[in-house]
């Protein structure tokens, strides 16, 4: 093949047709020798035949196709392979669609899917309006929705959208924008490309913005006072409705009507936070909740067939959520399960070399790393990594210290692990792993000892949050600068916690559940590095510690894990919580 990005698709087709691979070769050789051929195809004066026995064969003129494309189609008919390149893919798809050669159409569609980028996604989407390639159309359209903010900045094709095409994009729940300001700014850019002919469309486009979700100051200064809005009589009732909706939201909080009102309806999240398993009510739980950051709501998606697990690790890689190691109050696990969120199926994969409870897990360059932990006898300094393609775990260099109940993350191509418990004391040390040389190095120690810690890369720093210092559960947090090799303190959380989940969603650092020194908790809060402040988020429905979190982006069925837009309910009262609070925890 001429392009590496398409090679996987073609090798798959060869495997599907193994029975005919040799037959295809034989028939093509016969064609080239003029045997078993009874017609000649003529395209723009070019004859598709051999030099043998041409005099008695019927000639067919084929209009509307170039000789080079017909040559590829004929060769595909005999060989079931076709060279697809950036230069020929569109013309080849058009020709294949004309002659209903669906194998080539699918191959070209797969190739173009791999070529989708900010600059060409709109062009490819519009191209699919004329030819039957529904999967390519869906992929291109979702690429536009998922990368809207970046696409608006990079694409010149965006400026050529019709008003209806633009309106259809910005009204979608799947539009991936963190703030509605970005949608309004996109409208201004689109109108600004041709103001005399486009400013009249502001009244059509403005209601598609979730105006009541904007910051009031931005709305008043940038939307209400903009000339395109002020000069439109049709925009005035839209502005009034938005102000009323903003007032109701601020005074009364979220209500069931918010999801039916187009001005207050949250977009669907691009990424879903999964909170998996943990320790609840004095025993491990199999509970799984997902967090919809755009609606600030949790959804219970527990699969009752799954066994309980606590003090495990969770990681997302290439379409799967992996649950690694852990403890069920009897056994310490080396087993690993993976969950496919699209099909909602669970499968066992290869086990680790060691049993690991209190394990630290992270992902780096298509490998899952599992480090330290407790095997039921000793705290571990060993580490290993998993490669999904081979379904194998491989031991890597051991850490400098034994660490259970530590936490790990990746930043700038390296693995960082911080804190933990070595069997004698809570640790303030931290290490970094360089996979290129398979080597661990100690970095500057944290300012506090932290076992049951949460560690996450956020912005340009590694954050170490909460934990247990040997005497108290901690509210404090600190950030590591890898360039300066220094730690600095950041504002404290509202609540002390250890053994909690930690992740970054929509540029906010979330801490989920945990143990506060007296009880397991369902409390959630988030930190914004831009404001250097913590904020309360909606509580989980289940009290638990020893859970693990991971973030799953770009799900095609995201609505199944997000708050339902067609049946939204407001805040869940705490007396409806399904699991009671418990002071029981597994001893460190």
Language model feature labels by segment:
Residues 33-120, 145, 160-196:
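Canonical BTB/POZ domain core
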Residues 200-588:
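Kelch-like beta-propeller repeat domains
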Residues 1-22, 574-581, 588:
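Cytosolic, low-complexity regulatory segments enriched in Ser/Pro/Gly with interspersed Lys/Arg
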Residues 30, 76, 80, 96-102, ...:
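Generic recognition of well-structured, leucine-rich alpha-helical segments
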Residues 122, 126-131, 135-266:
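Eukaryotic adaptor/scaffold assembly regions
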Residues 67-71, 75, 87-90, 102, ...:
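Amphipathic alpha-helical interface elements that mediate macromolecular binding in regulatory proteins
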Residues 14-36, 252-261:
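Charged, flexible boundary elements
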């Amino acid at each position: 093949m001429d392009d590496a990005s398409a090679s996987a698709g073609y090798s798959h087709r060869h495997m599907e047709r193994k029975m005919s691979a040799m037959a295809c070769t034989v028939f093509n050789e016969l064609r080239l020798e003029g045997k078993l051929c009874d017609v000649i195809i003529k395209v723009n004066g070019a004859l598709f035949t051999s030099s043998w026995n041409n005099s008695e064969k019927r000639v067919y003129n084929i209009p509307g196709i170039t000789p080079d494309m017909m040559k590829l189609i004929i060769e595909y008919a005999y060989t079931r392979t076709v060279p697809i390149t950036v230069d020929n893919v569109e013309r080849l798809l058009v020709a294949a669609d004309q002659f209903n050669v669906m194998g080539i159409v699918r191959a070209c569609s797969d190739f173009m899917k791999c070529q989708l980028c900010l600059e060409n996604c709109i062009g490819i989407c519009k191209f699919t309006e004329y030819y039957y390639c529904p999967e390519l159309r869906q992929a291109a359209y979702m690429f536009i929705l998922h990368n809207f903010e970046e696409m608006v900045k990079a694409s010149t094709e965006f400026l050529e959208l019709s008003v209806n095409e633009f309106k259809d994009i910005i009204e979608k729940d799947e539009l991936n924008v963190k703030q509605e300001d970005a949608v309004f700014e996109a409208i201004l850019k689109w109108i600004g490309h041709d103001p005399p002919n486009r400013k009249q469309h502001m009244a059509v486009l403005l209601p598609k913005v979730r105006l009541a979700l904007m910051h009031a100051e931005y709305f008043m200064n940038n939307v209400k006072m903009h000339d395109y809005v002020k000069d439109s009589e049709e925009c005035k009732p839209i502005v009034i409705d938005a102000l009323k909706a903003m007032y109701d939201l601020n005074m009364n909080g979220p209500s069931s009507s918010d999801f039916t009102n187009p001005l207050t309806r949250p977009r669907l999240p691009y990424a879903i936070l999964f909170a998996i398993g943990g320790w609840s009510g004095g025993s491990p739980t199999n509970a799984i909740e997902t967090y919809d950051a755009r609606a600030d709501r949790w959804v219970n998606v527990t699969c009752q067939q799954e066994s309980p697990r606590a003090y495990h690790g969770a990681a997302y890689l290439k379409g799967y959520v992996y649950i690694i190691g852990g403890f069920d109050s009897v056994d310490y696990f080396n087993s690993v399960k993976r969950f496919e969120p699209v099909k909602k199926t669970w499968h066992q994969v290869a086990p680790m070399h060691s049993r690991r409870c209190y394990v630290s897990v992270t992902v780096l360059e298509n490998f899952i790393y599992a480090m330290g932990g407790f095997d039921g006898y000793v705290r571990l300094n060993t580490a290993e990594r998993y490669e999904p393609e081979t379904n194998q775990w491989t031991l890597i260099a051991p850490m400098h210290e034994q660490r259970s109940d530590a936490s790990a993350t990746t930043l700038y191509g390296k693995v960082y692990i911080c804190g933990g418990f070595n069997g004698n004391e809570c640790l303030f040390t931290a290490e970094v792993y360089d996979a290129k040389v398979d080597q661990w190095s100690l970095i500057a120690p944290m300012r506090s000892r932290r076992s049951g810690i949460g560690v996450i890369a956020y912005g340009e720093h590694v954050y170490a949050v909460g934990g247990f210092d040997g005497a108290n559960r901690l509210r404090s947090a600190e950030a590591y600068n890898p360039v300066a090799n220094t730690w600095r303190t950041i504002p404290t959380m509202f609540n002390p916690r250890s053994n909690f989940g930690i992740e970054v969603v929509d540029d906010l650092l979330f801490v989920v559940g945990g143990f506060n020194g007296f009880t397991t908790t369902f409390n959630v809060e988030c930190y914004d590095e831009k404001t250097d402040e913590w904020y309360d988020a909606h509580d989980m429905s289940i009290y638990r510690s020893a859970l693990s979190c991971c973030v799953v982006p770009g799900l095609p069925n995201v609505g199944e894990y997000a708050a339902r837009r067609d049946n939204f309910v407001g805040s869940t009262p705490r007396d409806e919580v399904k699991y009671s609070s418990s002071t029981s925890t597994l001893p460190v």
